[in-house]
Amino acid sequence: MDHLPLDLIDNILFRLDPISVIVMQCTNKFLRTYISDPKFDSYRFSLVGSSLFYISRHAPFYVTCQENIIRSYPCYILGSCSGLLLLDIGGCFFVANPFTNRSRPLDHSGSNILYDIVTCVNKAMCVGFAVDRIQNQTKKRFKIVCIVEMQMMYGFEISNGHSWRLSETTITSSSKSDLAKRTKPVYLEGTLHWLRNDGSIIAFNPETEQACFIPSVFHQEPETELFFASDDKINRLALVSGTKEEISVYTLAENAKWALARQIKNVFMEQCELEFWSLVMYDGKRLVVREKKRNLEGVFHVYDMEANNWGVLGSTFWSSKGVTDFYKLTPSLSFVEEDEVKDNIPCYDPQASYLTATLVENGV
């Protein structure tokens, strides 16, 4: 097969389901190298793009961190990175790739703080999930980092999927400000970043265990929505602030100051019909806003940063404003060591069976 034209190989591989593509890697060295190239993932999923998910049989294209009431086991998403999800299902934790139906159970018994975090909605932002590709392999390694907030000092508990330990690294900020509630950490260039209420940032590198305090300042105006993200086009942290009329995008400059990069007129929303709205996602290419009208399902509006226009991304059945923890998921064929294909998950493990059912139910 390695003697075939590359466009023909692509045509064959793109017609296969994700599991079959993974199996094809085992047939010869050429295919293993070809499929392992990160560019293959990018090209294969270029027409699919990134998505938002929530676990619901009614709306399979979005995922939220809120409890899934469809089944007996509550399901939460704690993180999303490089095509993998960190899931809490009935108190059991998994790293899963919903596009390949592969997953790996995690032992969390050694953690001293994870349970306290996941049982409190306002502490969900304390969990960081970092995924990196192992060089020259399709496998990825991951680390889970729980940040411990102690007045002006911060500590870090780390897991590589096998064990938990408290890092020797601590950092003390120069000012008192709490971590921004319900604001997910951003993983950028090997470092996890946690936003604080005053606009400053706690940064931690899971690999080197080095931490630093970024003394940036941002004063949030009343009646504004705030969203912490990264601009993938320029590899910089971004802060999106918006009202019903206008949305402003700021990027973190090298001098540790938030610089205004873009101002956008918000999508038109009828005030008399509007129940609530929120910022959902930003990646430098797209900005997603959720609008909920009274007695109607919610609508996701997407703004194309290059075309400078609004469009409709989809709808959601969620009616509560509290359901705001959406996660961007970029399709990938990669997997982590010791994960399992769904058919190999023991049927006697109810949480694992539930995970399998959830992934299948969501059309992946």
Predicted regions and their residues:
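Short, conserved recognition motifs on repeat-domain binding surfaces
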Residues: 1-364
